[in-house]
Structure formats: C-alpha cells, structure tokens
Amino acid sequence: MKRIPQAYKLILSRYALSLLMLYITQVVFYLFNTELFHIDGFSSVWKMFCGCTRYALSSLSVFLAPYLLMSLIPLPFKSNKIYKAAENIFFYLANIFMMVVNLIDTGYYRFTFKRLTADITRYLGVGGDFDELIPQFLRDYWHIVLTFIVLLSLFVLLDRLIRRRFSAKEEIHSAKQYATRSMVFVLCVALLIVAQRGGLQTRPLNLMHASMYCETQNTALVLNTPFTLYRTFGKPTLRPKHFFSEKEVKSIYDPHITPQTSTWADTLFASPLQVGKTNVVIIVLESFSAEYLKTYNTTGTTYTPFLDSLAQHSIVFQGLSNGKRSIDGIPAVLSSLPLMMEESYLTSSYGDNKLGSLAADLSKQGYATAFFHGGYNGTMNFDNYVKKVGFEYYYGKDEYNNDKDYDGNWGIYDEPFLQYMVKQLDTISKPFVASLFTLSSHHPYSIPAQHKGKFPKGSMIVHETVGYTDYALKRFFEQASKSDWFSNTLFVITADHSALTSQEEFKTQLGLFKIPMIIYHPSLKHHLVSDMTMQQTDIYPTIADLLHLKNDIFCFGRSVFSPQQHYYMYYTNGEYLLLMDGYLSKYTEGHSLELYFEKEDPGLKNNIAEKYKDTAAKHKRFTEAFIQQYNNNIISNSTHP
C-alpha cells in the first residue's frame, strides 16, 4: 500500500466513500419502507447485498465517470487549482445527485412500488401543479429532508478527512511515470466499462436482472434509483416481437373483439340495458385500495360506509389495477390500455397514437361525452388524452371557476366538485357517457375545514380522506337520484390504483393491486359478489357487453360476462405477471417462467412450474402472444378498431 501514489489512494478512498453513501441510502430506503418487503433469513440478505453491490458499482461508474477520468488521466497541469476545483465539483455533484434521487424514491416508492425511471421527467412536465406542491412535500417528508442533511454532513466530513490524509501534489517527472500512469488510466477505463455493464456477460446489466437476486417484491432493494434513471434514459420504449406468426398469435390472443353479452347478465336487470337508452358514469377514485371497504376487507374497519351500502345493491368483482400511477390508470379504465412498458403511455413517443374508448364508440351512437376532474387543467395531460379518445367536454378546475373550494394543493375538493358534476350532467344532452376522476384521497390528504373531525382517522394518514371521499360520493348519489337521468344510468366505480395498506392480505404480490370494482344500476334485481377478478382494462369491454354494443372494439381486456378466457396482466421492471385459471406466473424474456398457485401461496414461495408443465406452457404461450400484440399494435399505431 505504501508504494501506491497518494493520488491513487485519494481516488480509491473517495470511490469507497461514494459506495458507502450509496449503501447507506439503500438502507434508509429499506428502513422507511420495511413493511413493503419480505426478507427470509441471512442467505437472502447476502444474496441481495451482492446484487445491490453490482448495481451500485454500475451507477458509480456512470455518475463518477467525469471525476474519475479527470483524476486518472495523466496531464501536466493536474495540480492547477482550477482543475482540482473542477474535479471536486464533479465529485460532489455526482454524490449529491445520487443521494437525492435515492432519498426521493424512499418516499415516492410506496405510491408506485417501482423505482423511479427516466419517464419521471416527462411525468412531472405534464403535472401542471408540481412546483406548487414542492413546499408541501418538504413539510410532509421532513424526516427524509433531515436524513439528507445528516448524510450530506457526514459525506462532507469524511471527504475532508480523506483529502487531509491523502493530500499531495501530483507531478510527473519522467517518461516512465507518464507511461505507467497512462497504462493505469487505460486499465481503469476498462474496469469502469466492465462495472457499468455489470460484468463481462453478453448483455449489459438491466432492471430485469434484479430478479436473479430476490423475489419480485424485493427487487427495489437490489436496484438503486441512479441506476434505473440512467438505464432507462433515451431507451426505445417498445421493441417489435415475433414469437408467433400473425395467424397463430391471433388464435392465442386477439385484442380485436366483438361484444357478446351472456343471457344471464341480462337477467340481473329489470330489463336488458340498451345502447342509445342507457347512460354510463364511470367513477375512478383517487388512490383507493380495496382494503378500505368492508365489502373486501371483512375483518378490518370500514372507512367507506356509503360505498359498502351501495355494494349491497350492486355487482361486485375482485378489482385489480393495471398500474400504480394515475397517469397509467386512466387509460387502462377508459381505453383498456394497460401499462406494459417502463414509460407511461401518455408521456411516451406513442402518446399521439390513435386509441379506442367507450366514449368514442358511444359518441357514434349519439351519446354526449364528458370527463370530470377537479385538478388543474393539463394535469398529467388528461385533458388532451380524453379529447383524443372521444370525450367532447372536459370539466376541470378552470371550468369549476371557484377557488374558495380549492384544497391548496391539487384542485377542487371532492364534495363540491361532485355536486358541480351533477349540475352539468343535468344540462348535457341524453344519453351520455361521463367519467369522473376524484382528487381528495391523495397526498397530502387534506379535507375541508368544516368536515374535520367527522371521519375516522384510522391507523393510516389516508383513512380520513377516504372517509371524506366516501361522503362526497354519498352526496353525489343523493343529488343525482333526484335527476331524471339517474334511473337509467349504469355506474361503474373503481380506482386509478391502490394506495397505503396495513393488512398482510393487501401486501402480497397481488394484494398491492387490489382496488374496488363495483357495477350499479337502479334497476338491478340481484345483488352479486363474485370471486372473479376484474382488471381495469375489463371495464370498457364489460360495459360494451352490457349495452349490447354491436361494433368491434380494440381492447386489452375481456368482458367479465363473456365466455372468453379471463386473465389479469401486469408489468413491472421487465417482468410480466399473469393471473389466469387461479395460477400466477412471472415471465421475463430469456428466463424460465415461474408458476404459483396464488390462492394457496399468496407469498409466491413455491414455484410449481416443473410440476405443472402444461399450465406453465399455457401461461408462457399466452404471455408471449399478449406481448406481441401489445408491442406490435402500439408501434404500428393500430390500437383502434
């Protein structure tokens, strides 16, 4: 060690410090989100640590590259003060950035259950109100801000000690020294390339490799946010797939369908619903887990007395979301388009593609179409999206035009906005199809002053606002029931995605995506609670079925009343999850498929793919056909009838 030049000792020590800080932020990430992960024993921890190190070295090789290259390259003027200052600036900027994004994800992860990726920049760009929310986030997550201050102080202190210990002028006095240091420079560049690639394997390290070190639920502990950001930056969103011929893929899975209502579905109503006579209202609740309803959580406390009472007169399915963000949930509900790529569809390069929707189909049948959301106009590009898919009218914060009901963060409180919606529906022509996306049950979970203390606070911060939104829905239905259009209106109530949960049943791989799925009509004769799953993408074809719509539709779902194969599909970090026939499979291209019997093994501990080879083969075949249809239709702009 004594023969190693001081300059190299300094570089190695600073590199080790950067690695240490990345490790610490990973530990902080886990400590703040412990309840979201399940770790079994030391062997699991060790395996995850090895994977974590591999991803950490890849991140360091990218973000420290400017500092390392400047420090290692043999130049005669490296002792210049300006040059040294530039080295230090690059070193500090890289480390501060890595700490900041890892700590931001510490708070943000519990809302999306995935590490931040490069699409976050476009997501924030269409948020419309992000700048105004920064002070609120800093207040609510003060503990993360404090953690950053402590870690930054520790980092600065340790770096000063390192520089004091290994400070020395770097001078090259001979051609031999220059040659030696040039070889060291070339060697280090080669090592950086290997580290960035994650090793010498054929393909570079990517997000999917994290599943080699742990269960899918724990991959976020192996990954780090600096890696997921740089690895997804500038990448093509989708690639064409050719697992099967065009004829064969359609025989396995075809997104072009013709609605076919079963006779028994018609018998549930006083008389069959008909297109041209039945109004449709789709209510999408913000951040609403199935756990909040007694209808789904029979052992827990209910925070939704109205929804539970409405469910007693409705058709209830086991709802599952196709994404974890609002920007992904709305297209899944309205256009039957799930999230099957790293970037949100609405902010991707495909965002201008033509999409089908129930609104577009029903507008051809003479329906008026309207979308309601009390948030800022332009939020997540919803106003442009709904117009593109056939909604004629958009009612947002601007149209509401009364800031006395502004919540100070996102938009108009739910109760007054839902009353406003009833008034607007009274005025538009009939029949109509309308969709509502609520707002209040979202961080920072504020409710109007006059309602504080009225709703149970529960065990989680979200519970009080869930009670408020439930109350807003009650007032909406009370007012709407006085209108002529109410008696002939089909209501579908769901959520954009799930949110905070406390019970183990709702923390499993599947439980994290459980949302309400309630179908109500005043003429409904039979209350029904089904064990059948209904994903967000099933809403469009299900309504088309119930209304006896005759035209073909394009969708990545199936009517829950049709005899077609029912399934649930979800994508995260390169892994496709398929629930079909009671089995849950996990598919990653190039890897062996995993298969689990979900009801008996909700924690997905026992891979039965080898035991049930036919079922595993069926799941693989279906998943690959789905991927091919999804990718190729989006790439070719064919996601419409």
Positions of predicted regions on the chain:
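Short, function-defining helix-loop hinge/capping sites that tune catalysis or transport
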Residues: 34, 64, 113, 294-295, ...
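A generic hydrophobic-helix recognition signal that picks specific residues
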Residues: 19, 49, 95-98, 279, ...
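Membrane-interface soluble catalytic domains
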Residues: 205, 523-641
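Residue-level recognition of alpha-helix termini/interfacial anchor residues
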Residues: 140-144, 148, 451, 608-615, ...
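Soluble catalytic regions of membrane-associated enzymes that act on cell-envelope
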Residues: 197-554, 563-566, 572-574
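Transmembrane and membrane-interface helices of multi-pass
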Residues: 2-238
